[in-house]
Amino acid sequence: MTLLAVDFGSTFTKGALLADDGTVLATGATPTTGTLGRGDVLDGYRALRAALQVPADASVRACSSAGGGLRLAVVGYEATVTAQAGRRVGLSAGAKVVHVAAGALTTDAAAAVRASRPDIVLLVGGTDGGNADVLLHNAERLARLAVGGHGDHAVPVVVAGNVEARTEALALLAATSRPTVAADNVLPQIGVIAPESARAAIRQGFLHHVIGGKGLSRDPAFAAMVQAATPDAVLGGVEVLAGLGGGDVMVVDVGGATTDVYSCLTPEGEDASLRKDVVAPLWHARTVEGDLGLRWNALHVLEAAVEEHLLGAGPDAAPGTADLRAWAERAHEQPGLLPTDATERALDLELARLAALVAVRRHARPAQPTESPRPLANVTTLVGSGGVLRHADASGRDHVLEAVLADHAGGWKVPREAGARVDERYLLFAAGLLAAEAPDLARAVAAQILP
């Protein structure tokens, strides 16, 4: 039996039709529908099925970032400890972290949480057996806070703090009938970060309480087919890919609105044995740069490149910078803009190169001055994703990806022997969707990304 993997994206709905052995039979994309309050997201899905000639009996697995994806607010104890751990876990779960609050919520701080319009709140705080006062205070505040409504209509809260206070925190939230999901502590002890339980709980909250309420479809079939937020599925695919080759993997996904970086690393030496940082690194991690996109945020890419000394400004600007800025201004004003000739394609690829370089630097850079940079020296595979790379020729892809592999201006070791390739048929999300229920099939799909 064939299987259709679908990603409901913010701009395009993409699909991969797979044979029962994982062979890719067809891939395609159609514009996403239903995101502007008109139509239904399944209209575009049906057009995709028709274009791919999907058999009526094909099974379907889907992920979604349509309608703004998964918006997450993190409420923690200390900004540099549990709140930072919660933020990292939220990103690894595929969320867009729209707000981080630290300490006991005041009236103003609670209002800021509400103003961020989260789909889910991740409540963390305290190591296991440690301070519980702030966690319980914040649980009580959140119980009374009108985020998304009251009672069953309120935004769900994932409780992933001090396990010895978890039952009491859940009871405080239940007193106002707020939906909750219990998880293990994201920071059970100093120097240890435990993401999996909270990541699964965020996924559960997204599927049970969020995706059906996005107003994307009146048909319950949509919510029934979606299994994950898209970045969550992609990280799962990166994990599958890393398992295939046995080496460290990094993925750079350059999009129209954001640039996401994923890495799956195997710690070695002192990275594996010493707890050097208060919040340990996530070895399977994602960062999202909301200001680095080739269309909506094209001008911000140039600003960030100047800050990173990748691009000159004013009298220091290199020849061609004015043309690049003019292209970025057009792209910002016309998000649907596509290059029409070799000159415009070169400008778009240069914008992608800058976005990728800045995003990887930020991914590797420590969150706090006392922490270590992310060890990328053992990356053996760099995968590029995003339409700009999928539609580029070999020299265009090399222009972007080889620059990433050669960049060491952040002060860390660059990958020594990494090979670069592009996820040409956009298969990482499909591998991630299949990873839990059909790992052999997921590996067969991921293997088709490698040469």
Language-model regions: role of each:
Residues G28-Q53, A104, D128-G129, W296, ...:
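N-terminal phosphate-binding loop and adjacent alpha-helix
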Residues A109-I193:
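Internal, well-ordered domain-core segments that constitute the primary functional module
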Residues R49-S59, R117, A146-G151, L241-A242, ...:
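Phosphate/pyrophosphate-binding loops at sites that engage ATP/ADP/AMP, CoA/4′-phosphopantetheine
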Residues V74-A95, D108, R114:
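Active-site phosphate-binding/coordination module
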Residues S10-D40, G94-A95, L274-N297:
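Short glycine-rich, Thr/Ser-proximal phosphate-binding strand/loop in the N-terminal lobe
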Residues L17, G44, V134, K214-V251, ...:
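Helical "lid/coupling" subdomains associated with nucleotide-phosphate turnover
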